[in-house]
């Protein structure tokens, strides 16, 4: 437990940010899983709407620095490839 006032504040801030980051990352993962579930069930329309939601969540994670932009691009590319494979 920190004794210095600024260190106490930083600990509190770090805990708040950790929880906030975890919720954003969790929402991103959930959106990705929804796309993959739709693809597995051969639901093309549902997969396309889920893909736009997943892309939005992934981009928000990039904007806040949770995920590297290249990693996000890879996620989105793989999901798009799966969704496009349904309609083909």
Swiss-Prot record:
Biological-process GO terms, alphabetical: translation
UniProt entry keywords in alphabetical sequence: Ribonucleoprotein, Ribosomal protein, RNA-binding, rRNA-binding
Cross-referenced InterPro entries: Ribosomal_bS20 (IPR002583), Ribosomal_bS20_sf (IPR036510)
GO molecular function, one term: structural constituent of ribosome
GO cellular component: cytosol; small ribosomal subunit
Family: Belongs to the bacterial ribosomal protein bS20 family.
Functional summary from the UniProt entry: Binds directly to 16S ribosomal RNA.
Record's subunit section: Part of the 30S ribosomal subunit.
Name of the protein described by the UniProt record: Small ribosomal subunit protein bS20
Origin species: Bacillus subtilis (strain 168)
Source organism phylogeny: Bacteria, Bacillati, Bacillota, Bacilli, Bacillales
